[in-house]
Regions:
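Intrinsically disordered, low-complexity linkers and terminal tails enriched in Pro/Gly
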Residues: 109, 115, 198-202, 345
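Non-catalytic nucleic-acid-binding/docking modules located in mid-to-C-terminal regions
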Residues: 12, 16-25, 202-352
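A short, structural micro-pattern
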Residues: 73, 172, 279-281
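Nuclease catalytic cores that cleave nucleic-acid phosphodiester bonds
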Residues: 47, 126-277
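Intrinsically disordered, low-complexity regions enriched in proline, serine, glycine
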Residues: 37, 89-90, 182, 190, ...
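Noncatalytic, basic helical substrate-engagement surface that gates or grips nucleic-acid strands
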Residues: 3-12, 16, 20-164, 184-186, ...
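Short alpha-helix boundary/capping motifs
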Residues: 98-99, 168-169, 187, 346-347
Length: 352
């Protein structure tokens, strides 16, 4: 589960246009973004896009069209892929797998009964990322000339490291966990803008790009980063379930009143009879000392400059292999080549 602090973050959000990100380097949480593409780019009954060999292509569609739109607008994306998850995340991953299996069964049942809206909702909940999705996503990004980094651990943590090092202007993720890892600025809805229909309601909402700054968030909440981490632990993170009956507002009161993690642990044990199922010190350590590569400016430039557009390869991969329309892909390939040539003229540090 991603940490549920959305209600507390609302006052620190600002809505921005895509133009505001022109010239900015954005470290994108790859798994989070790809998951969104797989989830929403589906047919009315929830069936994902596939090619002639029945390989899923929803993620490729999202990566190609939405990433190219960012680049055309002058944004400089770099995707960060998850590595090996912390041991403490195992229970969360197992629970997710169980929920997705149940959702898949519900999807098949709803489809057979002709309940398209329910089928689509269950299909979205059944979304998962496998090795094919990861591999094909990396191959597409490579052919597009879009840099990506393989993080040793959590992708959000590595993206936050790039932010703190001044190598990325912001992290992009739908999850607020990025703040717990110390991301200084988080962009939400970067690739999800537009009108969205609310589940089971004939209501559409406009989804806009949001910008949230950690410093402003902490200031509005009146807490430190450590206290924000404790707050997250109280409502639940990917590494612990959280305290029953303690919502974000109560968690804020508890975290802001405590000066140490020991004090937080003692308070919730006495008041709520709650003991963390995972060592709370271990959870805190995951956020304060995550498993990341300490990337500096030279290494970052080396990574980014190693990627270049392969026009023929891109058309072959997307059109010959996966059945996308050649005229659209060719136009995107030309645009990416022009953008790449412009960056090359500016030198390898143009990503900084």
């Amino acid at each position: 589960m991603a940490v549920d602090i959305g209600k507390l973050v609302s006052e620190a959000k600002s809505v921005i246009s895509i133009d505001a990100l022109s010239g900015k380097t954005i470290a994108i949480d790859a798994f989070n973004t790809i998951y969104q593409f797989l989830s929403i780019i589906r047919q009315p009954d929830g069936t994902p896009l596939t090619d002639k060999d029945n390989r899923i292509t929803s993620h490729l569609s999202g990566l190609l069209y939405r990433t190219s739109r960012l680049i055309e607008n002058g944004t400089k994306p770099i995707f960060v892929f998850d590595g090996i998850p912390p041991t403490a995340k195992r229970k969360t991953l197992e629970a997710r797998m169980s929920r997705r299996r149940a959702a898949h069964e519900a999807w098949e049942k709803s489809k057979s009964e002709g309940l398209l809206e329910e089928a689509r909702m269950h299909a979205m909940a059944s979304t998962s990322i496998n090795e094919y999705v990861i591999g094909s996503s990396k191959e597409l990004l490579r052919l597009m000339g879009v840099p990506f980094i393989q993080a040793p651990g959590e992708g959000e943590a590595q993206a936050a490291q790039l932010s703190r090092a001044g190598l990325a202007d912001a992290s992009a993720s739908q999850d607020y966990d990025s703040f717990l890892f110390g991301a200084e600025i988080v962009i939400r809805n970067l690739t999800l803008t537009g009108r969205r229909k609310l589940p089971r309601k004939n209501v559409y909402v406009d989804v806009s790009i949001e910008r949230i700054e950690l410093k402003e968030l902490l200031g509005k909440l009146g807490i430190t980063l450590n206290q924000l981490i404790w707050l997250g632990m109280l409502v639940g993170t990917d590494f612990n379930q959280g305290v029953s009956k303690v919502g974000p507002k109560t968690a804020l009161k508890i975290a802001s009143s405590c000066k140490s993690l020991d004090e937080v642990v003692s308070l919730v044990r006495e008041k709520y009879g709650y003991d963390f199922e995972t060592d709370p010190i271990e959870i805190e350590h995951i956020f304060t000392n995550p498993d990341v590569e300490e990337i500096g400016a030279a290494r970052f430039s080396e990574i980014c400059s190693s990627f270049s557009v392969d026009k023929e390869g891109l058309v072959s991969f997307m059109c010959d292999k996966h059945g996308f329309m050649e005229d659209r892909v060719s136009k995107i390939a030309d645009m990416l080549s022009s953008a790449g040539a412009s960056r090359k003229q500016k030198g390898i540090n143009s990503w900084l």
